Amino acid sequence: MCTSKLEEITGEWPPPALQAASTTSSSEPCRRLSPPSSKRPAGRTKFHETRHPVFRGVRRRGRAGRWVCEVRVPGRRGCRLWLGTFDAADAAARAHDAAMLALRGRAAACLNFADSAWLLAVPPPATLRCAADVQRAVARALEDFEQRESSSSVFPLAIDVVAEDAMSATSEPSAASDDDAVTSSSSTTDADEEASPFELDVVSDMGWSLYYASLAEGLLMEPPASGASSDDDDDAIVDSSDIADVSLWSY
């Protein structure tokens, strides 16, 4: 109806202008230029990423460097579960793991740490009835985990302190025994010096001049006369000694 009426009005369809436009468009490539727009583009002009690059359910809060944990409740569209603010990103990641274990169970939970499945004591999802129960279970599991971590970090330090005390206790008796040995050796040395029959203090008392004078007098003294013996061997020895004495004392 409309085309017939237009044909009756114009007598031709499509109009000549549209025909010319169609012929030019078929011969030349189509070029579309968007008109300049004075409106600002929709959306945020400045975007600051606050999500953690590695951990799930963790994002930064403020410029103080603190981290928050918030997870989505499965089966409820738009429902989120707030788990708190933490000083470290790994603590917030542990809170996320505890919440996933409480909401989905150990088999279906997507965890940040693989050891969270056995390190976090979280009750099964069937025992939790509401979001408040999940939050309390997560807080209790994180508290138990932090206590175990702190006790395990303090226990090696206590072992080191006990070992150092034992070493010091063993070194003190050895030092005392060394002192006793030195004292006993010094006392034995003093006793030996007191019991020694040769003392140079006599020489110092006499004086070196008297010592040499007595030595010279001993050299000037005549040897004692040798007695005769009935044995031939003794006579031979006496004769040889007499010869030696004559040669020695002939001066």
From Swiss-Prot:
Residues 54-114 bind DNA. It is found in: Nucleus. The keyword Membrane does not apply. Residues 1-50, 169-198 are annotated as: Disordered. Its main location: nucleus. SMART domains: AP2. GO terms for molecular function: DNA binding; DNA-binding transcription factor activity. Transcriptional activator that binds specifically to the DNA sequence 5'-[AG]CCGAC-3'. Binding to the C-repeat/DRE element mediates high salinity- and dehydration-inducible transcription. This is Dehydration-responsive element-binding protein 1I. It comes from Oryza sativa subsp. japonica (Rice).
